[in-house]
A protein has these predicted regions:
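Amphipathic alpha-helical interaction surfaces in cytosolic regulatory modules
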Residues: 18-85
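Short beta-strand/loop segment at the start of cytosolic alpha/beta domains
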Residues: 1-14
Length: 85
């Protein structure tokens, strides 16, 4: 399964809905979508089914820069915390 990306802008905020498996091969496209977004970024992870360590580190870095991780599953949240330790 591939990753589907749906993007919605609403004023100054942009929500990027991620659907499917997120792997390192998707980082370039994700970074491009984020660069083209407004200052308030929301990453909706509700339909993410699988991540790898590079994605976990990427999500942690996004959050550290002010992005909101919406609907982040507990296992991804825990993994982000472990990578930041």
């Amino acid at each position: 399964m591939t990753l589907n990306i749906e993007k919605r802008a609403d004023g100054d905020s942009t929500t990027i809905r991620l659907i499917g498996r997120m792997q390192a091969e998707h980082l370039e496209e994700l970074e491009k979508q984020i660069r083209e977004s407004g200052p308030a970024l929301i990453l909706d992870l509700n339909e993410v089914t699988l991540v790898d360590v590079e994605i976990v580190r990427f999500l942690g870095a996004c959050e550290a820069r002010g992005a909101t991780l919406l609907n982040c599953s507990p296992y991804i949240r825990d993994w982000i915390g472990k990578e930041q330790d």
